[in-house]
C-alpha cells in the first residue's frame, strides 16, 4: 500500500508545482491520508468523530474488530433501556419537525412524547430473545444501548417479533418474508450497521452474526446484511443519529460518548465480517490497470470571466465484492459524487458510476493558472486480494489544469491599439519597378504570459486589389507580445491613383477557444499613384526631360571622377558594367 501511495505522491509533486493555494491543501490532505494503514483521515463535517477516536484502528480482520471494540468501549457511558423513552426525541428527531420523531421501518413521523408505548415503543434491532438477559427500564448493555434500539410502531414491532433479517434480493417495503424479516429499502443499511455495531461492541457477550438462520445469541443473515450495507449507504439521518447519541453538545442528558464505527467508517465492515481478500479495483478508462492506478490529465484553456462547462467521467469497478470509496475535489471544483459514503454493490462486476466534474466561477475570475484534482480512493482496508485490489488499489486521479487568459488583442502597432492602418505606397513611375512597404500584426493583450494567443484571418478586400496587394497568409496562435510581419505592394504596370481596403478578423486562438466569437476587425487601407513619368535615370544634365550629348558627358565626368553617382549597377564599384547600364538606360529614352 505505502509503495503504491509513495509512487502516487511523487507523481503528485511532479504534476503540481505549488502555484495555487488549493494545490497545497489537497497535498496536505493526501499526506495525512498516508499516515495510517487502515485509518483514513476524512474532511471534517458536523457529524464526524473526533480526529483521534479511531486512531488505533489500524489492523484488519480480528485485530481490527478488537481495535474497534476498544474504541467504542473507551469512555462509553452506558444508558438504560428506560432512558431511550426520553433520548429518542434527540437522536431520532424528525429533521422537518423538531417535536416529532421518525419510526423505523415505516418512517412514520409521530410525537416524540413517550405515552407508555401507545404511539411508539422500543424495537430491539437485535431481538432481546436472541441475546443474554431481558430488558427492563434499568437494563443497560446492548439491551439498553440506543445504537441497538429504534422507535417503532407497536404493531410493526410485534409483527416482526424476533425474526432475523434476510432475503438478500428483496426490495421495496418492509415486512415478514417467511423465516426472515425485510426492513425495507430505506432502513436495510441502517439495520445492518446497527447489528455490526452490536456484534463488535458486545462481542464479549456472545453476540455473533452468521449466515442463514441464527440460533441462540446469534443474528443474521450476515450475507444479506453485508449486501444491504453496500446498497443502502449511511445517509444524513443515520449519521446525525450516530452523532447525536455520542455528542454532549446535542445530547447532554443522555449522551453515550461512543459511536457506531460502521456508520463512521463503513469500509471496515468487509474486513471484520467477510475476509481479507476484497477483489475490487476502481479505475477511470477502458482497461483495468494492474495496480489499480488510473489518471486523466485534463488541460483546459479559458478566458477570464468565461464559464467552463461540466465534464462527465466514468468510474469503473472490477471484481465481485462490494466496496466503499471516497471522492474528493479540490477547492474550485465540484463533483456529482463526493465524500466517503459512496459504494459499489456486491456480486456486480463491471458496474460503473458516472461522475460529473464542475468548475466554479472563481477559477476564471482572474488570469493565471489553476491546478486541482478529483481523487477517488478505494476505501477497502484488506490487503490479501492481490495487486490493485482492496487496499492495494492505488488512488485514481483526474488532474485538472486550467490556464485562464485575458482576451487577445490585435493591433497594427506594438505599443498601442491601432485598428486601422493607412499605408501610402507613394508615387512611382510606370515601368520602374513595384513599390512595397512592410507592416505587422501585433498581439497586445493584457495578462502577460496569460494573454490569449490570437488568430488573424482575411475576410474581405475591396478596391484596386489588382494593383495594391498584400502577401498576407493566415496567422495562427500569435503569442501575446509577438508580431507577424507582411508587406503590401503596388504594381507599376499601369498609371493611375489607386486605393484598396483589406479587412482582417481577429479571434482568440481557435485551437484553444473553439467556441468563442471574434474579438475585433482590423483594416489595412492602401493607397498610391503610378505616373507616366519623365526620362529614364540616364537624364543626368540640363535640359532635363531630354536625353542628349550633355547627359553622356555628365556620366563620363562622373565616371572619370570615380563618383558613385555613376554606379548604375549599385554594386559600389565603377567598371564597364556601369557604362553598359547607362547606355541601356539612355536607350530607353523619354516617353
Predicted features along the sequence, with ranges:
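N-terminal module-boundary/linker segments of secreted carbohydrate-active enzymes
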Residues: 41-107
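Domain-level detector of nuclease and nuclease-like folds
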Residues: 115-276
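Short, His- and charge-rich active-site/binding loops that engage polyanionic ligands
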Residues: 101-112, 117-119
Amino acid at each position: 500500500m505505502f509503495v503504491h501511495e509513495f509512487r502516487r505522491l511523487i507523481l503528485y509533486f511532479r504534476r503540481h508545482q505549488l502555484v495555487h493555494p488549493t494545490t497545497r491543501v489537497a497535498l496536505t490532505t493526501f499526506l495525512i491520508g498516508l499516515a495510517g494503514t487502515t485509518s483514513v483521515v476524512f474532511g471534517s463535517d458536523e457529524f464526524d468523530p473526533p480526529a483521534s477516536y479511531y486512531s488505533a484502528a489500524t489492523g484488519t480482520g480480528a485485530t481490527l474488530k478488537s481495535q474497534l471494540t476498544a474504541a467504542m468501549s473507551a469512555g462509553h457511558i452506558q444508558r438504560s433501556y428506560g432512558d431511550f423513552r426520553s433520548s429518542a426525541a434527540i437522536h431520532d428527531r424528525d429533521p422537518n419537525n423538531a417535536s416529532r420523531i421518525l419510526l423505523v421501518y415505516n418512517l412514520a413521523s409521530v410525537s416524540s412524547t413517550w405515552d407508555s408505548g401507545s404511539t411508539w415503543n422500543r424495537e430491539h434491532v437485535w431481538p432481546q430473545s436472541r441475546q443474554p438477559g431481558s430488558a427492563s427500564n434499568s437494563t443497560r448493555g446492548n439491551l439498553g444501548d440506543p445504537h441497538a434500539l429504534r422507535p417503532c410502531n407497536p404493531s410493526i414491532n410485534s409483527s416482526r417479533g424476533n425474526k432475523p433479517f434476510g432475503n438478500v434480493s428483496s426490495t421495496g417495503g418492509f415486512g415478514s418474508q417467511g423465516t426472515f424479516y425485510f426492513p425495507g429499502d430505506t432502513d436495510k443499511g441502517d439495520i445492518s450497521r446497527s447489528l455490526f455495531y452490536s456484534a463488535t461492541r458486545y462481542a464479549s457477550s456472545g453476540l455473533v452474526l452468521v449466515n442463514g438462520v441464527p440460533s441462540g445469541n446469534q443474528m443474521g443473515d450476515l450475507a444479506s446484511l453485508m449486501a444491504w450495507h453496500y446498497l443502502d449507504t449511511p445517509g444524513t439521518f443515520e449519521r446525525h443519529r450516530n452523532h447525536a447519541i455520542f455528542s454532549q453538545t446535542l445530547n447532554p442528558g443522555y449522551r453515550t460518548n461512543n459511536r457506531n464505527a460502521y456508520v463512521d467508517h463503513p469500509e471496515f465492515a468487509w474486513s471484520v465480517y467477510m475476509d481479507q481478500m476484497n477483489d475490487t479495483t476502481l479505475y477511470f478508462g477502458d482497461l483495468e490497470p494492474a495496480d489499480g492506478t488510473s489518471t486523466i490529465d485534463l488541460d483546459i484553456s479559458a478566458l477570464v470571466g468565461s464559464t467552463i462547462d461540466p465534464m462527465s467521467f466514468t468510474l469503473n469497478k472490477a471484481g465481485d465484492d462490494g466496496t466503499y470509496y471516497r471522492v474528493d475535489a479540490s477547492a474550485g471544483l465540484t463533483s456529482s459524487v463526493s465524500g466517503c459514503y459512496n459504494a459499489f454493490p456486491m456480486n456486480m462486476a463491471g458496474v460503473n458510476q458516472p461522475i460529473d466534474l464542475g468548475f466554479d466561477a472563481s477559477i476564471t475570475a482572474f488570469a493565471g493558472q489553476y491546478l486541482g484534482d478529483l481523487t477517488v480512493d478505494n476505501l477497502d482496508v484488506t490487503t490479501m486480494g492481490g495487486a490493485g485490489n482492496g487496499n492495494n488499489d492505488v488512488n485514481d486521479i483526474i488532474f485538472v489544469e486550467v490556464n485562464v487568459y485575458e482576451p487577445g488583442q490585435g493591433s497594427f502597432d506594438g505599443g498601442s491599439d491601432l485598428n486601422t492602418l493607412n499605408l501610402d505606397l507613394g508615387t512611382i513611375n510606370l515601368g520602374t519597378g513595384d513599390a512595397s512597404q512592410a507592416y505587422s500584426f501585433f498581439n497586445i493583450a493584457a495578462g502577460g504570459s496569460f494573454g490569449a494567443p490570437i488568430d488573424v484571418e482575411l475576410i474581405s478586400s475591396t478596391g484596386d486589389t489588382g494593383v495594391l496587394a498584400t502577401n498576407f497568409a493566415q496567422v495562427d496562435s500569435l503569442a501575446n507580445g509577438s508580431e507577424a510581419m507582411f508587406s503590401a505592394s503596388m504594381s507599376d504596370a499601369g498609371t493611375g491613383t489607386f486605393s484598396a481596403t483589406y479587412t482582417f478578423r481577429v479571434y482568440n486562438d481557435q485551437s484553444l477557444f473553439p467556441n468563442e466569437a471574434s474579438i475585433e476587425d482590423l483594416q489595412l487601407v492602401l493607397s498610391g499613384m503610378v505616373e507616366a513619368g519623365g526620362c529614364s535615370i540616364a537624364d543626368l544634365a540640363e535640359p532635363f526631360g531630354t536625353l542628349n550629348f550633355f547627359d553622356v558627358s555628365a556620366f563620363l565626368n562622373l565616371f572619370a571622377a570615380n563618383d558613385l553617382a555613376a554606379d548604375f549597377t549599385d554594386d559600389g564599384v565603377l567598371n564597364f558594367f556601369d557604362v553598359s547600364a547607362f547606355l541601356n538606360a539612355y536607350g530607353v529614352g523619354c516617353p
